[in-house]
Amino acid sequence: AGAVIPGWAAIEELGGVDTVQVDADELFTADSVNLEDIRIFKGGRIDRAILYAASILNQSCETLRGLFRQISEDRTDILSPVKDLETPYGLGFAAWGDNNRVLIGNRAYMEKEGVPVPETEYEEEHSQHGTLQILYLAVSGNLHAMFVLRSTGGRNAARGLEVLQKENIRLLVTCKDPSLTARHITDAYHLPEGMVTLLEQDQCDALNAAPAQPE
């Protein structure tokens, strides 16, 4: 069995390694996520949806913070104060803002919290059958918006991943962005199917508990 090496450090000297572990923040920078579409649901308002999302993501998600800061023209002064931030891994974020409980996350998170979501066919259509990322926003238990996103790979990470691909080394990814899947990472960097695994919470815990590799 090969070792799990965290990060890009000494990537050219990976003798005997079969797996590298990185965080999604190392694959996608704050300016690599694009907003493709916003769908607003009954009772929602586009300006409020963007403000809620920007306020929470500014404190909780590196890869999405840049996008929503850009949409709000970097006006951090207009962001709502956020209280009691929760970050259930792989699902999304919850917080109190403007006296409302706000949830931002994927379909699984909305369903877990009892928020009604559109039919899967609607999501499939707007995500172009899973090619694009979907991020839902709910306020006080009601679905307000669906953000449709696309992440673009970066040049530096692409070079590192090319080395891994040549050596048949798999990539384990920890990720706070609930809209990202292994497929999105694979597509963004044109990697072979099966090379990328998005880690679950218990796998992250096991990695953190594992003894560090000797220098």
Outline where the language-model segments fall.
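Conserved catalytic phosphorylation-site environment of P-type ATPases
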Residues: 1-54
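Juxtamembrane coupling segments of multi-pass membrane pumps/enzymes
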Residues: 1-11, 69, 75-78, 185, ...
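A generic structural motif
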Residues: 35, 42, 108, 150-151
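Conserved ATP-binding TGD loop and adjacent catalytic N/P-domain core of P-type ATPases
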Residues: 97-99, 139-215
